[in-house]
Amino acid sequence: MGKIFFYEDKNFQGRSYECNSDCSDLSSYFNRCNSIRVESGNWILYEQPSYRGHQYYLWKGEYPDFQRWMGFNDSIRSCRMSPYHQGQYKMRISERGDFQGQNMEFFEDCPNTYDRFRFRDIHSCNVFDGNWMFYEEPNYRGRQYYLRPGEYRRYSDWGASSARIGSFRRVHHIF
């Protein structure tokens, strides 16, 4: 079981809320979130209720301001624990929607998709094993998209507004 603390102000000040399970709407517990302490577990945070909006992946540690978790603002409205995965990682990406066009399989992290293959956009993806994180920019920067095993027929299925993915990596658990 995981535990995460949300604070309204920077440097772990102001009103706080302790959470130890998935929560689809945090808005009744705090108005804004400017710092976070993850005591245990790995968490995916969302800017909007019902697990929507910008996503942020956090693990055990202290985040004294929202820029430390690559946040764009002080809005965190839902959270869920990342399920633990043991074993292989496997994902197939496609240059077009509905798994059309050129396909490539990956078992390892990719810090720069532009250097790795000829197409710059990922329009669909099938995650076979493990949990993965897509990033809009190379070197694991920019907006984050958390992917669990399953089919993603178009980029909007993983919450993106465009098909641009600059890097991706396997989600490893840190406790």
UniProtKB/Swiss-Prot annotation:
Gene3D superfamilies: Crystallins
InterPro entries (alphabetical): Beta/Gamma-Crystallin, Beta/gamma_crystallin, G_crystallin-like
Pfam families named among the record's database cross-references: Crystall
GO biological process: lens development in camera-type eye; visual perception
Domain Beta/gamma crystallin 'Greek key', residue spans: 2-40, 41-83, 89-129, 130-172
Keyword Repeat: yes
Record region (Connecting peptide): 84-88
Family stated for the protein in its record: Belongs to the beta/gamma-crystallin family.
Record function comment: Crystallins are the dominant structural components of the vertebrate eye lens.
Subunit structure, as described in the record: Monomer.
Domain characteristics, as noted in the entry: Has a two-domain beta-structure, folded into four very similar Greek key motifs.
The protein's name in its UniProt record: Gamma-crystallin-3
Organism field: Xenopus laevis
Gene name of the record: cryg3
